[in-house]
A protein has these predicted regions:
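A structural signal for short, well-ordered beta-strand segments
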Residues: 3, 55, 74-76
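Conserved hydrophobic "DFG−1" position in protein kinase catalytic cores
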Residues: 5-6, 13, 76-78, 95
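Short loop/turn segments immediately following the C-termini of beta-strands
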Residues: 16
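The catalytic Nudix box helix
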Residues: 23-56
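Active-site-adjacent beta-strand/loop module that shapes the phosphate/pyrophosphate-binding cleft
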Residues: 60-83, 94, 121
């Protein structure tokens, strides 16, 4: 489960061990809904309080040959505007202006999810 959180025309991303930027999130635990998983992961990884709103898309990402993961991306809204705090799970975190996303080293699926959620957020106002 991955979450797209947009604040002030910027999206929060974390840098992983492969030096790629990615959406924050994580794996489901037993008896946990996808929405519960995402809220828990955002709190653990970034100390952000979010509410997952809708599934944006899903896709399979091949990390290395023979190792693939199913990515399900949600559009999320913040339930409070806490300052994001980096956990030890990632190398860095940063709020990127939406206009910079396409130039980042990150899987195209994440970029598509960010574009989709950004368009929905703009449409709602």
């Amino acid at each position: 489960m991955k979450g797209v959180v947009i604040r002030d025309a910027s999206v929060i991303l974390v840098r992983n061990e492969r030096d790629e930027w990615e959406l924050p999130g994580g794996k489901l635990e037993l008896s946990e809904s996808p929405e519960q998983c995402l809220a828990r992961e955002m709190a653990e990884e970034l100390q952000l309080e979010i509410v997952p709103k809708s599934i944006l898309d899903s896709w399979v990402y091949t990390i290395i040959p023979g190792v693939s993961v199913l990515v399900i991306a949600y559009g999320c809204v913040e339930s409070s505007r806490n300052e994001a705090v980096l956990s030890d799970e990632h190398k860095a975190l940063r709020w990127f202006p939406l206009g910079e996303v396409d130039s980042l080293r990150m899987p195209d699926g994440y970029k598509a999810s960010i574009r989709t959620w950004s368009a929905r957020v703009r449409a709602v106002g």
